[in-house]
Amino acid sequence: LILMAVALPLAFSVWSALLNNFVVEVIRFDGLDIGVLHTIREIPGFLAVGVISILLFVREQTLALSMLALLGIATAVTAWFPFLSGILTITLLSSVGFHFFETVNQSLQLQWFSKEEAPNKLGKLMAYGSAATLIAYIFIILGWEKLNLSFNSAYMLAGLSCFAIAVIGYIIFPNFKAAVPQTKKMVIRKRYWLYYLLQFLSGARRQIFVVFAGFMMVERFGMDVQQLTTLYLINLILNIALAVLLERAVARFGERNALAVEY
C-alpha cells in the first residue's frame, strides 16, 4: 500500500503540473480544447462503477497494480503525442488507469486495516502520498533548467518510475487475502443521499477550478513551468500546514458545521 501510495502521485503530480504548459506551448490549446480534454478525462471516472464487473474475473490487488502500470505507461509517453487527437487518446488511457486504480485502492485500504487501526494507517498513507507529490514538485522546479529537463524527459521519468513500482509490487509482494470478503455488487443506501450529493458538488467545483485555473495562468499570464509548479507547491504546503487546524476545527465544531462552512 505504501508503494502504491507513492507511485500514483509521482506520475499524476508531474502529469498535471506540466499539462497546461505542454498543451499551450506545444499543441497551442485554447479554452475549448482544454475543456474537451478534461471532459474526456472524466469519462473513465464516471464509468469506474464498471470495476465491479471486472472484479468478477480479476483480483483487486492485481487490478490495482495493472491500472497503476497503465497510468505509468500513459504518463511516460504523453509528450509523444503533440497533437489534439493524440493527447486526447493518451489522456483517456491515463485516466482509466488513474480512476480504476483509485477505486480499487480505496477498497483495498479499508479491507486490509481493522477499524481500530484504519485512521492511523490511512493518515500515514496520505502522508507518504503528500511527500511524493512534494518531491515531484521540487524536482521540477529545481531541475527544469539545471538538468535541462524537457516535457518528454520529465514525463518519461515520472511515468516509468510509476510503472517500475507497479511491476515491483506485482513481483515481490504476494496476493494478500483480505480478512473480510469483498462484496462484488453495487451498494446504494438511501440514507447516504447527502454524502452522494456532497461528492457530486465537490467534484463539480474541483473540476471547474482544475480545468481553467492553471490553464488561465499559462495562456493569459504567460507562466512558465517553474512558476506554475511553484504555485502548486505553495498550495500543497499550505494544505499540509492547515490540515492540523482543520482537523481541530472538525473535532471542535463537528463535521456538519465544518462542511456547511466549506460549501
Please report, for each region that a protein language model flagged, where it lies by residue:
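Short amphipathic helix-loop junctions that connect adjacent transmembrane helices
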Residues: 17-33, 211-231
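Intracellular juxtamembrane helix-capping segments at the cytosolic ends
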Residues: 19, 100-113
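Transmembrane alpha-helix termini and helix-breaking/packing motifs in multi-pass membrane transporters
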Residues: 25-26, 49-57, 134-154, 214-215, ...
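Helix-to-loop junctions at the C-terminal end of transmembrane segments
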Residues: 47-60, 144, 242-255
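Structural signature of the two symmetry-related core transmembrane helices
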Residues: 63-76, 257-263
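Helix-loop junctions at membrane interfaces in 12-TM secondary transporters
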Residues: 79-90
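Glycine-rich segments within core transmembrane alpha-helices of 12-TM secondary carriers
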Residues: 120-139
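C-terminal membrane-cytosol helix-exit motif in multi-pass small-molecule transporters
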Residues: 140-144, 159-178
